[in-house]
Amino acid sequence: MLPVNKDQVLLQNTVPPGCPPQVLSQFVNSPAPNLASLCPHPTLPSSHFPLPAPPQAYFFSSLTQTHSPGPHFSSDSNSDFVPPHSSSHPRSSSCFGQNYTYFGEKLPSPHSISPSNYQLCVSPPLTGSSSLSQLQHSSPHSCQSPSRLQDLQSPKITSPVPSSPSPRIQNNKQTWQWPQSGSIKSSRGAGVCVPSKVDPAEFKDSGTLTQALVDHVGRRRIARDLQIQFLQRLWLGTPGHAPVVEYPICLVCLQIRTPSCPTPKYKTVPQLLAFPQLLPCVQGQESGPLRIGIGFGLRLPRGQARALHLLPPKNSTPVGVESQEEALQRQKSTIQESVQITGTLFQARSLRSIDLQSPKPSQCSRSLLQEPRQVAASPKAGPSVSKRSVTLGSILRKSPS
């Protein structure tokens, strides 16, 4: 509403709320009981009056003569003039005897207007953010109802400064009707846990089960959540490991867990993990430019993973994997074999050397028996003689006779 000035005060004082000025002359000098008969509709407060107050005064006239009005509307004998700054009432009631009443400086000819069409003209000096549109009135003799007064406002009202709407004026064309929460339904049927057609035990592989869960959750959503985690860490500057996004999963519907999903049997809830991963730009080439990809993992309790046949049985060991005990036993056996092989080779070499040095076995035996005596008789002999005698004696003892 425009600020209240003297002209608006004049209109509000002379015209009671709820009735247009065309019946003003009929109740100026009439008693109070006749007012109810003139206005059959309930009265409205002054804030519902559709005409804003212009800076100039309005002129009221009847269309009894076909003269052209001047710039200030020269009135005749059957018209009255309301001064702009006076609070007095009009003197005579003859000027409002006609049914055709217009406001403004320019009045159209009465012959060119049909009785059923009436226009509302506003003076040119009115310039503001709001403008009144020309509307057609169907019942000129009766007072305007609240619905009529509500329709007088234009649906296209532009204001440079946003302001809170008046509690009395309701404009449904300007307010955006947001959809209610009940009308928005999720793709899962309003959050109901619907069992999946595929049993998780049929996958028999954690990789295929993880891919199925990723397809149900949505790769775009996972990428967006991981990107938000990246930006949050960059903004806060928190060091640490790479961000990991965790999604609690229901293995009944193969979707993200909701309150309608059944309670899990185990304490740890199955979770789908998404984390950044460095991958080569060209598959199969480890050396070269890298790109950032998304890796996925599945966190399950051991009992549930075993029930879904995602873990190998305890007895069956994969090919190529050996226990530590077996490895130690094999090492011991190889060490013993190597020692035996080296012992036999050393014995063979020593026997060959003895055969070459002593052409006759009788002489060799005699010389070996005499060597200890020589060692005892000559204690100053070198250590090489004693070593040689010891080695030869041990060889003779071990060699077959």
Swiss-Prot record:
Q: Which InterPro entries match?
A: DUF4679
Q: Which residue intervals are annotated with compositional bias (Low complexity) in the record?
A: 83-93, 129-147
The UniProt entry, under Pfam families, shows:
DUF4679
Q: Where is the composition biased (Polar residues)?
A: 69-80, 148-186, 357-368
- Segments for region (Disordered): 69-93, 129-191, 357-401
Q: Which PANTHER family match?
A: PROLINE-RICH PROTEIN 30
Q: Under which name does UniProt file this protein?
A: Proline-rich protein 30
Q: Which organism is it from?
A: Mus musculus
